[in-house]
């Protein structure tokens, strides 16, 4: 199992627009071979010092893929290129962690 945690930071005030595009792309991703989980998440309010907030312009993408090859095919998929082109000017930063079980 391959795990991906991607921290996405949008330009100020654009998170909802990026999430709208993300949600529109989700059905195509969920239909991909090997996709176990693919979903965005935002900060849970009221957690205090227990958490390190992503912030109002950020969200995390939580992914699970059956194999590394499935993840690589996902990254090269035409719908991902289209999503990337749609949101690229709205993003300030992205950090992607690709992990394996320990």
Regions from the PLM with identified roles:
Residues 11-13, 101:
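Generic structural motif
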Residues 27, 34, 70, 92-96:
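Generic structural signal for secondary-structure transition and capping sites
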Residues 39-57, 82-102:
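Glycine-rich beta-strand-turn "strand-cap" elements at beta-sheet edges
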Residues 14-40, 79-83, 87:
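Short amphipathic alpha-helical segments
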Residues 1-2, 102:
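Absolute protein N-terminus
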Residues 2-9, 39-75:
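Short, well-ordered beta-strand segments in beta-rich or mixed alpha/beta enzyme
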């Amino acid at each position: 199992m391959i795990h991906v945690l991607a921290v996405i930071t949008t330009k100020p005030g654009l998170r909802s627009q990026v999430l709208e595009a993300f949600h529109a792309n989700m059905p195509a991703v969920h239909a991909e071979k090997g996709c176990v989980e693919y979903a965005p998440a935002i900060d849970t309010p009221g957690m205090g010092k227990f958490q390190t907030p992503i912030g109002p312009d950020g969200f995390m993408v939580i992914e699970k893929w059956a194999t590394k090859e499935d993840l690589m095919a996902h990254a090269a998929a035409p719908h991902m290129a289209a999503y990337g082109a749609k949101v690229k000017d709205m993003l300030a930063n992205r950090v992607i962690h690709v992990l394996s079980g320990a």
